[in-house]
């Protein structure tokens, strides 16, 4: 983003607050949120040295809300992609929906693999494999591998820890994510209850 990380943190906090209020909840500011915002803002400004981001933690503690806020923030700045001339955007998909798209809409699947910034919400909730006309497909493994090979920014949210992601998706995927992904822990409790 074309701003420093401190300014990005202020904008991101405002975007999170707006998203929380949009969902008819009360925004709660605190130390844990400040750490999360600072890490994500650092990543958004390209200062982390990693091209992908993992928001990992328990249920209901704000990971998806962060992604919606990032999506609104990136849209607000209207940053142009030098290759396409179009504005960058964050495309957000639920992991279960991605598995379904892979199976039922192959053309859409192919185009979303190349999205500027792809956000995968609830990594770990989707079926690991799907069968299509006798072919066994591993949509998320294939998607993460493709985006790794092409160095495309990917945002992941998950209730799984990085270690659990390695166990579920294999050592190779875990190692690739370790290399390319800034991990932001969400250690706070659920905001839902």
Enumerate the language-model features and the residues they cover:
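A short, basic N-terminal segment
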Residues: 1-49, 183-184, 188, 193
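Hydrophobic positions on the alpha1 helix immediately C-terminal to the Walker A/P-loop
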Residues: 66, 70
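Conserved nucleotide-sensing/catalytic segment adjacent to the nucleotide-binding pocket
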Residues: 84-148
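Post-Walker A helix-loop "phosphate-sensing" segment adjacent to the P-loop in P-loop NTPases
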Residues: 72-90
């Amino acid at each position: 983003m074309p701003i420093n990380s401190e300014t990005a943190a202020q904008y991101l906090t405002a975007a999170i607050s707006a998203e929380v209020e949009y969902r008819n909840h009360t925004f709660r500011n605190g130390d844990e949120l400040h750490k999360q915002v600072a890490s994500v803002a650092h990543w958004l400004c390209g200062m982390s040295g990693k091209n992908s981001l993992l928001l990992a933690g328990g249920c209901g503690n704000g990971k998806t809300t962060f992604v919606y806020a990032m999506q609104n923030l990136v849209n607000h700045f209207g940053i142009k992609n030098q290759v396409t001339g179009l504005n960058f955007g964050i495309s957000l998909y639920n992991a279960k929906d991605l598995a379904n798209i892979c199976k039922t809409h192959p053309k859409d699947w192919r185009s979303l693999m190349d999205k500027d910034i792809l956000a995968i919400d609830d990594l770990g909730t989707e079926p690991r494999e799907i069968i299509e006309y006798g072919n066994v497909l591993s949509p998320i493994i294939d998607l993460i591998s493709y985006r790794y090979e092409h160095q495309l920014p990917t945002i992941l949210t998950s209730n799984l820890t990085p270690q659990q992601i390695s166990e579920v998706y294999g050592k190779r995927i875990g190692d690739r994510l370790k290399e390319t992904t800034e991990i932001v822990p969400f250690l706070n409790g659920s905001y839902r209850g």
